[in-house]
Amino acid sequence: MKKQFNRMRQLANQTVGRAEKTEVLSEDLLQVEKRLELVKQVSHSTHKKLTACLQGQQGAEADKRSKKLPLTTLAQCLVEGSAILGDDTLLGKMLKLCGETEDKLAQELIHFELQVERDVIEPLFLLAEVEIPNIQKQRKHLAKLVLDMDSSRTRWQQTSKSSGLSSSLQPAGAKADALREEMEEAANRVEICRDQLSADMYSFVAKEIDYANYFQTLIEVQAEYHRKSLTLLQAVLPQIKAQQEAWVEKPSFGKPLEEHLMISGREIAFPIEACVTMLLECGMQEEGLFRVAPSASKLKKLKAALDCCVVDVQEYSADPHAIAGALKSYLRELPEPLMTFELYDEWIQASNIQEQDKRLQALWNACEKLPKANHNNIKYLIKFLSKLSEYQDVNKMTPSNMAIVLGPNLLWPQSEGNITEMMTTVSLQIVGIIEPIIQHADWFFPGEIEFNLTGSYGSPVHVNHNANYSSMPSPDMDPADRRQPEQARRPLSVATDNMMLEFYKKDGLRKIQSMGVRVMDTSWVARRGSSAGRKASCAPPSMQPPAPPSELAAPLPSPLPEQVPDSPATPAPALSPSGASLQPTPERPSVSKSKELSPGSGQKGSPGSIQGTPCPGTQLGPQPAASPSQLPADQSPHTLRKVSKKVAPIPPKVPFVQPGTVSDQPVGQPSPVSLSPTPPSTPSPYGLSYPPGYSMASGQLSPASAPPLASPSVFTSTLAKSRPTPKPRQRPTLPPPQPPSVSLSASSPQSTEHPMLDGMSPGESMSTDLVHFDVPSIHIELGSTLRLSPLEHARRHSATDKRDSEEESESTAL
């Protein structure tokens, strides 16, 4: 306590007074002392931040630290997710690999943190909290010793002064000696402490390089940790990529063809094969295939299903338009068209060649230059389109129509140009490329092809919903293939008009031709399958192209009133069972076309059914001739419509009459035919039924005027005299269905109203010659169905006429 008091008094004297003060440290040690404080501050803050960077629990063992590590928790979560999803899925495999990798990374992190904690954090802690504070503590202890020494010196000096003035020298001398010893002892302690402090300070300065190594060690440990982590990641990445590459269920829409084929190991793209195979099962007879737009939601769903290689064949077999839309969408979404950008100019140049043989050869050369993958797929697709064109009478998709709707999806320019140019010149050039390839598919790609390459598509039981709505059947069609009349109506919601005809009617084709662009043959205007083509058959005979030869000739009435001299009607013998014999006269043979009805063929695919109207004055049996005015009042004119028949040029016939009977058809009365045109694909299902194998002349027999036949079913009649000259007829008030550009001559008003014209195909014409002739013999076998009374016929057709009229009204409204 006394020592402490002396220190305080000495310190006060040194501070306030002018007492002697001994210097504790040298100038160099004072600089070291200042640096000690700075190093202590830096080491303390660094230790604190490094400790915060540790993810594990500091000071804990490796096992305990691992449980608290976030990476370990993540790894456990990934492994558990993999077990839930299963190893057979791609996502499950990815989770398992990533979980194992994260667990290894967690172990590396634990090792890294332990090493950092041992080699960096703990040494920094010792430096900041132990070594530097010890030096500072020695510095404070030295300061105390110096104060003690100064205090002892001061007291000894005071004692020495006072002893010189005192008379008793002995006691004063003893006290001074004691203080001198105390002073010397304090000086020794100060010297020892100063030496120790100086050594510690110099040692600190010398060890600064060691302190710097702590931070170097930190970087090295981090580098080693990241190096090991990178090694782990680099080792697992190839495994992850291999799993993804081995997984074949990858999106195919919008992906390069070669990439898709390489991943899936296929020769034909999956969407192409899937769509083609399903269309072969359910869409070959679908009307407007590739042209009718599918439901947007159905198309989106099917595209998504094709992307993941999962297709429900049973579901989409009922919607072939969605399948066709998906195929078109896949072709259009390819980054490069199936016929390639590289060969685009060559394709266009080939299409501009005028000579057909050279053009085909140029197209073949370009086709051979296609890459193997593209060549295989275009071959597969063209072979399918060629097969589809075999059903063009039913599906209305001719090679031209298919080229129109699919051409822009198979080839397009790399640089998008003017939209108008794209829609006119370029589009038609592309159509000119695709159409001949489809038409000559076996020449471009010889040999047969197996469409179902993978065998993974079933053959579901399918009912073609549009199969009941085909247009007029071909005469060559087998009777068993023809549908019943009630099944022969197509839905009005399906567009079936010929696309090129619509383009032609808008005058677009002629504009393009005027620009000097070569376009394919426009003979499509007169195609048999076109509804407008059938309407065009009402044009005057001079407007019709020559007709093809026929297998069997059947007489036709002349479309014009025949100018024959008045002569009394001569009796005609009754028809004998051997057939009707009609002898022609050698006067001005006509080139009028007539049609034959194939055995067993009927109205609109109904086996063994036919309708007919008699020519004015025509008679079968001993009944008077029927005029148009004698038709039942409630009978629809649609019952008089005919089916298409083959024709052959023969002289027109003169209707045979009952002895002493002439036609009582009034003046100006048109022939008994509907003045309201019916859509060609909506035929009337009514008519007389004949057993298969029976045939009639082209002149139609009105069901209402059919006589009851009680006589033998086969009889013969010979007509040797022409009919009397009829009076001029008035022109009908309702114009016939025909293109606007065609005008009818006033000299042939009846040609537009004759019942034969509604059933004629494009390319058929009728004669306008005025001749006298005898009708050749006609062999008719009448079955039991003709033995109905007129009253019974009228009752039958009265009920059906109302239903037909309602259907026509609905068709017209829609």
Curated annotation (Swiss-Prot):
The modification Phosphoserine is found at S493, S805. It comes from Mus musculus (Mouse). One of its GO terms (cellular component) is recycling endosome. GO terms for biological process: modification of postsynaptic structure; modulation of chemical synaptic transmission; negative regulation of filopodium assembly; negative regulation of Rac protein signal transduction; regulation of dendritic spine morphogenesis; regulation of GTPase activity; regulation of neurotransmitter receptor transport, endosome to postsynaptic membrane; signal transduction. Residues 467-493, 528-769, 784-814 are annotated as: Disordered. InterPro entries: AH/BAR_dom_sf, BAR_dom, RHG17/44/SH3BP1-like, Rho_GTPase_activation_prot, RhoGAP_dom. This is Rho GTPase-activating protein 44. A motif (PDZ-binding) lies at residues 811-814. Residues 567-581, 598-612, 622-637, 684-704, 741-752 have a biased composition (Low complexity). Specifically expressed in brain (at protein level). Detected in olfactory bulb, cortex, hippocampus, diencephalon and cerebellum (at protein level). Expressed in hippocampal neurons (at protein level). Signal peptide: none annotated. Residues 727-814 are annotated as: Interaction with BST2. CDD domains: BAR_Rich2. It is found in: Cell projection, Dendritic spine; Recycling endosome; Presynapse; Cell projection, Dendrite. GO terms for molecular function: GTPase activator activity; phospholipid binding; small GTPase binding. Changing R291A: Reduces GRIA1 recycling. Abolishes the increase of spine density and size, as well as reduces the increase of GRIA1 expression in surface associated with long-term potentiation. Keywords: Cell projection, Endosome, GTPase activation, Phosphoprotein, Synapse. The lineage of its organism: Eukaryota, Metazoa, Chordata, Craniata, Vertebrata. It comes from the Eukaryota. Rho-GAP domain is required to promote GRIA1 exocytosis from recycling endosomes. Rho-GAP and BAR domains are necessary for the control of long-term potentiation in hippocampal neurons. In dendrites, BAR domain mediates the recruitment to patches where plasma membrane is deformed by acto-myosin mediated contractile forces. Residues 479-489, 790-805 have a biased composition (Basic and acidic residues).
